[in-house]
């Protein structure tokens, strides 16, 4: 947006004030305008209007309304010089966080200062909507010596687009053609692999046994019988000699404990071997014989249940109706008494 105020009494226009990019470069302009306004106030007090150069704005919020400007000029008040939005400044390029959306970088050197400080970096950044989807252009404007500007465009492509390899990085073509291999090793087919179950044995071999608790599921707690659960002497009348009672307790417990250990030492491994075969045989019969036969029988009975009512209605019932009709006229004759003549026998002529 551009605005320009002219004097009503003067026909000639003043020369335009030079334009600047940053706010720091407008200090000299402000001092010159103050001196010129003070000199013009003594000669043209009734028609005093402060001259403003051509100002540039970035946003609408920075622009004052025209009524406020005329009100201040009518009251001989100084209209403040519009200031441009300051851009973030950094000491070096490494301090910039969001380098993805940077469109312009300007490096300013401290020419007027005798202090040896690092140049300041001013970042000009566009909005996200103004940046392309596939690439970001970064313009570096460096002025280490003077105010000369060098534009060095650099395009950073998105990582999803593969970049072509440099000719030097490409592998050189082979000088000699390699001979084709006659033997090819095909990976083994897991469906046809002869697996004897080594993976299933591994958890058993590395299993750590709990030597203190050998009945983790409490399935044989009824075997925990002691001497006092088997032998009891209820009253003094049935008390045996003290040494007999004491030695009986010790002998019973010791013999029971060591007899079990000796029996397990002799027959434990054999019974474990036979038990493994027996349970494996039962599992084999259940998986490969009993269960298939059970499934087959259930399938057959399901078909019989559908056919049986029709068999009873259309075959069995008519058959027994016919048998009942045949034997319903049966008569029993005895040698004693009057002979019973059937109905159809009355019409038969005997020769």
From Swiss-Prot:
Keywords: Cell membrane, Golgi apparatus, Membrane
Tissue: Expressed in intracellular bodies in intestinal cells.
Main location as per UniProt: Golgi
Biased composition (Basic residues): 38-51
Deletion phenotype: Defective in the apical uptake of lipid and protein trafficking. Reduced brood size thought to be due to attenuated nutrient supply.
Residue ranges, compositional bias (Low complexity): 167-184
Composition-biased stretches (Polar residues): 1-14
Source superkingdom: Eukaryota
Cellular component annotations (GO), alphabetically ordered: apical plasma membrane; caveola; Golgi membrane
The UniProt record lists the keyword Cell membrane: yes
Membrane topology: Peripheral membrane protein
Single GO MF annotation: molecular adaptor activity
Region (Disordered): 1-55, 71-93, 144-193
Compositional bias (Acidic residues): 22-31
Cytoplasmic side: 1-261, 291-351
Biological process, per Gene Ontology: caveola assembly; cell surface receptor signaling pathway; parturition; regulation of egg-laying behavior
Subcellular location: Golgi apparatus membrane; Cell membrane; Membrane, Caveola; Apical cell membrane
Role, per record: May act as a scaffolding protein within caveolar membranes. Interacts directly with G-protein alpha subunits and can regulate their activity. Thought to have a role in the uptake of lipids and proteins in the intestinal cells; operates in the apical uptake of lipid markers and trafficking of yolk proteins. Affects fecundity and egg laying.
PANTHER family registered for this protein in UniProt: CAVEOLIN (PTHR10844), CAVEOLIN-2 (PTHR10844:SF19)
Protein known as: Caveolin-2
The encoding gene: cav-2
């Amino acid at each position: 947006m551009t605005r320009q105020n002219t004097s009503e009494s003067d026909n000639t226009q003043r020369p335009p004030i030079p334009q600047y990019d940053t706010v720091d470069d407008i200090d000299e302009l402000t001092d010159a305008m103050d001196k010129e306004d003070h000199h013009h106030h003594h000669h043209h007090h009734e028609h005093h209007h402060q001259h403003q150069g051509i100002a540039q704005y970035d946003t609408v919020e920075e622009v004052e309304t025209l009524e406020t400007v005329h009100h201040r000029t009518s009251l001989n008040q100084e209209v403040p010089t519009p200031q441009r939005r300051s851009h973030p400044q950094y000491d070096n390029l490494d301090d910039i966080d969001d380098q993805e959306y940077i469109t312009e970088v300007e490096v300013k050197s401290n020419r007027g200062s005798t202090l040896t400080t690092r140049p300041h970096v001013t970042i000009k950044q566009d909005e996200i909507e103004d940046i392309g989807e596939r690439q970001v252009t970064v313009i570096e404007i460096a002025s280490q010596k003077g105010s000369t500007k060098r534009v060095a465009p650099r395009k950073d492509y998105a990582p999803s687009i593969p970049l072509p390899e440099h000719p030097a990085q490409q592998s050189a073509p082979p000088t000699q053609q390699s001979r084709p291999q006659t033997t090819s090793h095909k990976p083994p087919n897991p469906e046809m692999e002869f697996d004897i179950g080594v993976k299933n044995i591994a958890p058993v071999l590395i299993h750590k046994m709990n030597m203190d608790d050998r009945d983790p599921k409490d399935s044989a707690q009824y075997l925990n019988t002691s001497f006092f659960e088997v032998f009891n002497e209820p009253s003094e009348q049935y008390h045996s000699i003290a040494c007999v009672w004491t030695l009986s307790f010790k002998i019973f417990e010791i013999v029971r404990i060591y007899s079990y250990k000796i029996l397990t030492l002799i027959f434990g491994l054999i019974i474990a071997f036979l038990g493994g075969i027996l349970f494996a045989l039962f599992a084999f019969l259940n998986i490969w014989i009993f269960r298939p036969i059970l499934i087959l029988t259930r399938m057959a009975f399901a078909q019989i249940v559908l056919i049986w009512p029709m068999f009873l209605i259309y075959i069995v019932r008519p058959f027994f109706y016919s048998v009942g009709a045949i034997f319903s006229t049966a008569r029993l004759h005895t040698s004693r008494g009057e002979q019973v003549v059937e109905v159809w026998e009355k019409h038969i002529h005997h020769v």
